[in-house]
């Protein structure tokens, strides 16, 4: 029964990830695409956690942390690009 619930949850997460990919492709504005990319990162973390529970292993926990860090850095970089038009500033006024 528990395995069935995990498989259903994996299916739901896969469908929502697919819908977010459509939002990234068709998104009317760039901020919509950024939010969809962030949600894809969160879904990947959840899918990895569900697979880890399903396989009864803790081997994927490092991958979950890595995906979380990369998703956070990507969101910050996109936000900075939307705000200033560049990610890394060459001219800094000190």
From Swiss-Prot:
Its main location: membrane. Forms a heterooligomeric complex that consists of seven subunits: MrpA, MrpB, MrpC, MrpD, MrpE, MrpF and MrpG. This is Na(+)/H(+) antiporter subunit F. The keyword Transport applies. The lineage of its organism: Bacteria, Bacillati, Bacillota, Bacilli, Bacillales. Mrp complex is a Na(+)/H(+) antiporter that is considered to be the major Na(+) excretion system in B.subtilis. Has a major role in Na(+) resistance and a minor role in Na(+)- and K(+)-dependent pH homeostasis as compared to TetB. MrpA may be the actual Na(+)/H(+) antiporter, although the six other Mrp proteins are all required for Na(+)/H(+) antiport activity and Na(+) resistance. MrpA is required for initiation of sporulation when external Na(+) concentration increases. Also transports Li(+) but not K(+), Ca(2+) or Mg(2+). Involved in cholate and Na(+) efflux activities, which may be mechanistically coupled. Does not require other Mrp proteins for its own function. The chain crosses the membrane at residues 2-22, 34-54, 59-79. InterPro entries: MrpF/PhaF-like. GO terms for biological process: sodium ion export across plasma membrane. It comes from the Bacteria. Belongs to the CPA3 antiporters (TC 2.A.63) subunit F family. One of its GO terms (molecular function) is sodium:proton antiporter activity. The gene is mrpF. It is a multi-pass membrane protein. Keywords: Antiport, Cell membrane, Hydrogen ion transport, Ion transport, Membrane, Sodium, Sodium transport, Transmembrane, Transmembrane helix, Transport. One of its GO terms (cellular component) is plasma membrane. It is found in: Cell membrane. Pfam families: MrpF_PhaF. Mrp-dependent antiport apparently occurs by a secondary, proton motive force-dependent mechanism, but the similarity of several Mrp proteins to membrane-embedded subunits of energy-coupled NADH dehydrogenase complexes raises the possibility that there is a capacity for electron transport that could provide a primary energy coupling option for Mrp functions. The keyword Cell wall biogenesis/degradation does not apply.
């Amino acid at each position: 029964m528990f395995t069935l619930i995990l498989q259903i949850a994996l299916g739901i997460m896969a469908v929502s990830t697919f819908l977010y990919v459509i939002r990234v492709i068709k998104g009317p504005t760039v901020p919509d695409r950024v939010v969809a990319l962030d949600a894809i990162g969160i879904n990947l973390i959840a899918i990895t956690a569900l697979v880890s529970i399903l396989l009864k292993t803790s081997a994927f926990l490092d991958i979950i942390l890595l995906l979380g860090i990369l998703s956070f850095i990507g969101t910050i970089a996109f936000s900075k690009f939307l705000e200033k038009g560049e990610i890394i500033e060459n001219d800094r006024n000190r």
